[in-house]
Amino acid sequence: MRFANTLRRGAVLSVALALLTCVTACGKTAAQKQREEAVALTSLGEKYVKEKVRDPASAQFRNQFIGKGGAPCGEVNAKDAFGAYIGFQRYISVARELTLLAQDVAPADFEESWRELCR
């Protein structure tokens, strides 16, 4: 009898967890899931860009969007070694090791990457 009660409680708990999971995950529309994914990718892109600028705490972002294949693209402005903002420049962040700032590569190379990944 004791085993049956334990088994019954376990089954009830399993059903409750399954319902809760379905309510939280299944209740979202495709658009909501897409927005959440875009926010997560944008945040990750900001993190990787901040690792590349001289003063990460000063980084300001604008015109951000998710490009082709899920690459976060946008513009960043940050302070240089003298404490002055350098002006907004475009960035592409495919991964930590594949984050490009416009100032770090030849203009023609950056433009080609921007066309392929961001437009």
Protein language model regions, located:
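Sec-dependent bacterial lipoprotein signal peptides
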Residues: 1-24
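Cystatin/cathelin-like cysteine-protease inhibitor module
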Residues: 26-119
